[in-house]
């Protein structure tokens, strides 16, 4: 009787493992799926974000599946953290990006966070230089 029960449990366990299938680990930051179109840092969340700090300007490009998002009326704040130093920059709509003049030149390892409000929705993007 014990052998029959053991065989039933083993058979049931094998069937359950087959139904469950292989595990699938999934990272929802698809930064490796896309490339930055302007040479900046890329982050994907509610939208695709590209942050570029170059030539005295901070630029944030926002796209949705490769198509530019209308940034009319959008507001954004860029926070850059370098060690204990914190710099906040307000970004304003400018054509197909949000931008601001800046003198900051983040070093490797500095962190950046963008808080964006566009079309009544808020989202956050994080970057590492």
Enumerate the language-model features and the residues they cover:
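Intrinsically disordered, low-complexity terminal tails/loops enriched in metal-binding residues
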Residues: 2-129
């Amino acid at each position: 009787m014990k052998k029959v029960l053991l065989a039933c449990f083993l058979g049931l366990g094998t069937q359950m493992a087959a139904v469950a299938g292989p595990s699938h680990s999934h990272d929802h930051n698809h930064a490796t799926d896309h490339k930055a179109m302007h040479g900046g840092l890329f982050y994907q969340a509610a939208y695709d974000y590209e942050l570029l700090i170059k030539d005295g300007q901070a630029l944030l490009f926002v796209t949705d599946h490769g198509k530019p998002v209308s940034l009319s009326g959008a507001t954004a704040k860029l926070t850059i953290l370098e060690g204990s130093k914190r710099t906040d920059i307000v970004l304003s709509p400018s054509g197909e990006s949000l931008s601001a003049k800046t003198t900051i030149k983040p070093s490797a390892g500095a962190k950046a966070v963008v808080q964006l409000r566009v079309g009544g929705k808020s989202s956050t993007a994080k970057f590492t230089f």
